[in-house]
Amino acid sequence: MQFEWDEQKRKANIRKHGFDFRDAGKVFNSPMLVAPDNRYDYGEDRWIGIGMLEGRTVVVIFTERDDTIRIISIMKAMTYEKNKYEQHLRNQLGYD
């Protein structure tokens, strides 16, 4: 799996959210909950992924271009996103 990003957005994301796009692979190697990002018309299909990064629940906004995942943003998950992710994991494991 290959990743790409805009370098200026990566630096801005570190300043704003404290997460480096270079760590995106770790999130994609954990169980993820992925849904389409339909908040706006971006002119391309965007996805919202919730997963784990170094013990923290994070949200990754991304798009797929050919065989490459383009990272748009990584941020700490809000409480409702964390709860949704935890429920997804419980369902996957058959606990609910």
Which residues does each PLM region occupy?
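Ribonuclease/tRNase effector modules and their secretory precursors
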Residues: 1-96
